[in-house]
Amino acid sequence: MLKIGSHVSMSGKKMLLAASEEAVSYGATTFMIYTGAPQNTRRKPIEELNIEAGRKHMELNGIEEIIVHAPYIINVGNTTKPETFQLGVDFLRMEIERTSALGVAKQIVLHPGAHVGAGADAGIQQIIKGLNEVLTPEQTVNIALETMAGKGTECGRSFEEIAKIIDGVKYNEKLSVCFDTCHTHDAGYDIVNDFDGVLNEFDKIVGIDRLQVLHINDSKNVRGAGKDRHENIGFGHIGYKALHHIVHHPQLMHVPKILETPYVGEDKKDKKPPYKLEIEMLKNGNFDEGILEKIKAQ
């Protein structure tokens, strides 16, 4: 079974149940959530996440596995502000606890961190230090380091940087990788014409068995732009054909594929989620040039 879904919202009183209902309405077989707002660390207690009802709904609809994404504000790569580093460490520990409580997520996607001017090597050493403070041999969930576009002072912009982080971490069996198509393209990898070659390079440097999550996004920018701006499937510089090939790649069939493409519409207050129609289009193998108008009309 193709594991494909999108980022969905876990909010209100229904929490996990709301997320599962939204995912099912898109025809998804997996989904990704933030356990609270991605831009802050305010979180509801575990008992208010409505886990039991959410899991029951998932089971009834054949969803076995979901992904958690850590908030953007975590930066364990920060060498200049000890309080930012410490917040990242403490919050990651909490996220591991919350994700374990969900019982249906095995991966927490994490942007590795930004070196904020200290240089990539210093940032990577700080990320290693942070992960060594967080990871334990007993934990049942992995931290999935996301491949980054190389915007600003981001670490993890190359497979070598990801491998360096993994190699420095003591309990690195608890580390995996989230391969983001937009980020990897923006970082300079030719996933359009030679995805198999890129995957082979990833396997040599990091190990393909570490690739446990895929973020499926088109890109508004040319390859190597280092920008990180997601585009709807088939309307960017990666294109439908390449993304369809990645989604159905025989070596990655077991990997959950998560869409983080932009909502569609001119009116900021009335944008529509593209996921139902994009998932359908990636399943059926035919690019629909009129899909954006259909999304707006939903």
Curated annotation (Swiss-Prot):
Residues reported in the UniProt entry to bind Zn(2+) 1: H69, H111, E146
Keywords: DNA damage, DNA repair, Endonuclease, Hydrolase, Metal-binding, Nuclease, Zinc
Species whose genome carries this gene: Bacillus cereus (strain G9842)
Cross-referenced SUPFAM superfamilies: Xylose isomerase-like (SSF51658)
HAMAP family: Nfo
GO molecular function: deoxyribonuclease IV (phage-T4-induced) activity; DNA binding; DNA-(apurinic or apyrimidinic site) endonuclease activity; phosphoric diester hydrolase activity; zinc ion binding
Top-level taxon: Bacteria
One example of a Gene Ontology biological process annotation: base-excision repair
Transmembrane segments: none
Cofactor note as given: Binds 3 Zn(2+) ions.
Presence of keyword Membrane: no
Ligand binding (Zn(2+) 2): E146, D180, H215, E260
PANTHER family per the UniProt record, alphabetical: APURINIC-APYRIMIDINIC ENDONUCLEASE (PTHR21445:SF0), ENDONUCLEASE IV ENDODEOXYRIBONUCLEASE IV (PTHR21445)
Protein name: Probable endonuclease 4
Names of required cofactors: Zn(2+)
First-tier enzyme category under EC: hydrolase
Binding site for Zn(2+) 3: H183, D228, H230
EC number: 3.1.21.2
Protein family: Belongs to the AP endonuclease 2 family.
The reaction(s) this protein catalyses: Endonucleolytic cleavage to 5'-phosphooligonucleotide end-products
Task of the protein: Endonuclease IV plays a role in DNA repair. It cleaves phosphodiester bonds at apurinic or apyrimidinic (AP) sites, generating a 3'-hydroxyl group and a 5'-terminal sugar phosphate.
Pfam families named in the record: AP_endonuc_2
